[in-house]
Structures are given as structure tokens and as C-alpha cells.
Swiss-Prot record:
It is a multi-pass membrane protein. It is found in: Lysosome membrane; Cytoplasm, Perinuclear region. It comes from Bos taurus (Bovine). This is Membrane protein BRI3. Pfam families: BRI3. The keyword Cytoplasm applies. Interacts with BRI3BP. Interacts with MGAT1 and IFITM3. PANTHER family: BRAIN PROTEIN I3, MEMBRANE PROTEIN BRI3. Belongs to the BRI3 family. Its main location: membrane. The gene is BRI3. Keywords: Cytoplasm, Lysosome, Membrane, Transmembrane, Transmembrane helix.
Length: 124
């Protein structure tokens, strides 16, 4: 086996000052934070109005309040407030779902009818 001689020298120190050692260091003060930024340039405002009138639009809404003891059923009939609306698909919606297979389902769900079984009211 071939044994290579080990390095007997020590590595260079880590705390070298600028200009010492065999590596080139940056000039003194490089990367230091400046004392103060230069003053800003003054600018002149000529002919531009500084005050703009503000316009506030105030809208009022009519809020319908229900009595505290009323129960609102999701999907309930707004006419009789007793029945629950049932969905049914129209003939045209089913036809388009078959003919335009992947995209026809959008038409099928867009063309459905909702009907109340209690009062018979139809909603589209």
C-alpha cells in the first residue's frame, strides 16, 4: 500500500484581518451600513388640487324579521310553508343528458322542476 504523507501544516486562522493571509479580502468598510441616507429631493406641486370632495353613498335595506318562534325548513315550500319541495327532471333535460353525455348532466340539472306535494305549486 502506498501511504501518502499527511499535511503537517495547520490550516489558516479564521479571524484574519483585511490584507493578511493568502486570501484576498474585501476592502475595509465594504458591506458596512452607511451613516445616514441622503436627504430627499423637494418636489413642487403645481396646479394639482390637493383636496378632493368625498362622496358617501348611504343605502338602506329593508330587513324582514320573522318572529322568534317560527321554524324555517330548508327546502320547504314558500307558498304553504308545510310541504317539502321535490325535484323532478324535465323531458328536455333528460334528453340532453343522453345526447350530450358528459356535458348533458349540466343541462339536466339546470332544467329541473321543483314541486310541492302539499299545495301543488311548481317552481323552476
Amino acid at each position: 500500500m502506498d501511504h501518502k504523507p499527511l499535511l503537517q501544516e495547520r490550516p489558516p486562522a479564521y479571524n484574519l484581518e483585511a490584507g493578511q493571509g493568502e486570501f484576498a479580502c474585501a476592502p475595509h468598510g465594504y458591506g458596512a451600513i452607511a451613516a445616514a441616507p441622503p436627504p430627499p429631493y423637494p418636489y413642487l406641486v403645481t396646479g394639482i388640487p390637493t383636496h378632493h370632495p368625498r362622496v358617501y353613498n348611504i343605502h338602506s335595506r329593508n330587513v324582514t324579521r320573522y318572529p322568534a318562534n317560527s321554524i324555517v325548513v330548508v327546502g320547504g315550500c314558500p307558498v304553504c310553508r308545510v310541504g317539502v319541495l321535490e325535484d323532478s327532471f324535465t323531458f328536455l333535460g333528460i334528453f340532453l343528458a343522453i345526447v350530450l353525455f358528459p356535458f348533458g348532466f349540466i343541462c339536466c340539472f339546470a332544467l329541473r322542476k321543483r314541486r310541492c306535494p302539499n299545495c301543488g305549486a311548481n317552481f323552476t
